[in-house]
A protein has these predicted regions:
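Extended, low-hydrophobicity, Ser/Thr/Pro/Gly-biased non-transmembrane segments
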Residues: 1-92
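Extracytoplasmic/secreted proteins, especially bacterial periplasmic and envelope-associated proteins
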Residues: 40, 119-126, 130, 158, ...
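Active-site rim elements
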Residues: 23-32, 113-119, 201-203, 252-259, ...
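Acidic/His/Gly-enriched intrinsically disordered linker/tail segments
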Residues: 204-206, 210-271, 275, 293
Length: 387
């Protein structure tokens, strides 16, 4: 539980327990592979405040002193996604034009933030349409889509997204150049697909949540502001890659690969997109994987097998290098008058990956190996490795 007070000195309470375990506050089999198939959440609070939880509100029983809120989740839900939020909330009702039709949305915010939130959360309409374009229908319309102001930064609580970013447009630094995009709303909503609809089988596979969540940010920037801006964002994220340990490590050992799961995970997906060199196939994989494994528990190997089946190619060596080993491949290259020399070093035996380069702004696709190869280029040409 997060126990805080709002600016008016009133109770402002939430729950965020990913990593620590939901069994801290309610009885469950606390493992990523275990999910209740539905959930009744009944909370009694003083009548001068409100409780918001996952799912839809079925009943409110009010007396002069106490009020009981009865929420119900109709779909399977991760243990750590079950949450309650208690505060002096105002409710903003909205509608979202989904691929499934016009759907209701609710935003629960501290009463003194109602006006700013009403304007700020208009972005959710564009965001939802964009994410449904990439991944298919929002999985939880049956339980609703809510943004709930919380006393902590944010969390992907299913059908009740926790929001605590103070209505900022991105957070700070380089992200502020994107203007109107709130990364908490975006990233946590992305987890409704990557994390909640499809759930990692173990903490070791958490990149399936966070890498896809981060790359969703990239895709949304691309959708709203264009591809060059999304590359700029990716380049900034690359600065945070550490490569100190494998993204996916041993399972059943409480190995959470959070360190590189976000930034490197996003870059791995972008690299895969480049290797495929066909956006129709790449985005078909994203949407198809969501449909094929909807409301299921998956491991990284399930994703690799799915990609192999769709493409007819073997991408296991690609993921062995980038996901199961901490060392990225190194491309060594040099220029000498009219020659470009290039090769890979530090790669696993079966690894193979093309590289796109610009030679005087003309795109050339190379297939490096551990043996030095030569490309003849115009004298004193400008060569740029493409991102």
């Amino acid at each position: 539980f997060v126990w805080k007070t709002d600016k008016a000195g009133r109770d402002f309470i939430g729950v965020a327990c990913e990593g620590d375990g939901a069994s801290l506050w309610w009885p469950n089999k606390d493992h990523p592979t275990e999910e209740p198939d539905s959930m009744a959440i009944n909370v009694t609070v003083p009548s001068d405040i409100m409780c918001v939880a996952n799912g839809k509100l079925r009943e409110t029983i009010k007396t002069d002193v106490k009020t009981t809120y009865k929420w119900f989740v109709s779909n399977p839900i991760n243990n750590y996604n079950v949450s309650v939020n208690i505060a002096n909330y105002a409710v903003i009702n909205d509608t979202i034009h989904s691929v499934t039709g016009i759907q209701p949305a609710q935003y629960y915010v501290l009463d003194y933030n109602e006006d700013v939130a009403r304007e700020h959360f208009k972005e959710a309409r564009y965001m939802m349409r964009s994410l449904e374009k990439f991944f298919g229908p929002f999985p939880w319309w049956e339980d609703g889509y809510k943004l709930v102001e919380t006393p902590y930064l944010g969390m992907e609580h299913q059908s009740a997204i926790a929001y605590g970013n103070d209505f900022k447009t991105y957070d700070s630094g380089v992200r502020s150049i994107y203007g109107y995009i709130d990364y908490i709303t975006l990233h946590e909503t992305a987890h409704e697909w990557w994390g909640n609809n499809i759930t990692a089988c173990d903490g070791a596979d958490v990149w399936l949540h966070e890498g896809f969540g981060m790359y969703t940010e990239v895709l949304y920037v691309e959708d709203r502001l264009g591809y060059p801006m999304s590359i700029h964002y990716l380049l900034e994220r690359r600065k945070g890659i550490a490569n100190r340990r494998a993204i996916v490590g041993p399972r059943d050992e409480y190995y959470w690969g959070f360190e590189d799961a976000y930034n490197k995970g996003a870059w791995i997906l972008h690299t895969l997109r480049s290797v495929l060199d066909d956006d129709a196939i790449f985005f078909g994989i994203l949407k198809g994987f969501q449909q094929e494994f909807s409301s299921q528990i998956v491991c990284t190997e399930d994703l690799v097998e799915y990609i192999n089946n769709v493409t007819g190619q073997d991408y296991k060596p690609f993921f062995d290098q980038y996901i199961f080993d901490r060392r990225p491949p190194t491309l060594e290259y040099s220029l000498s008058n009219d020659k470009l020399f290039y090769r890979y070093t530090g790669i696993l035996p079966e690894f193979s990956m093309p590289i796109n380069v610009l030679v005087n702004k003309n795109e050339v696709r190379l297939q490096p190996t551990t043996v030095t190869q030569t490309l003849t280029i115009p004298d004193y040409a400008t060569v740029q490795i493409m991102d």
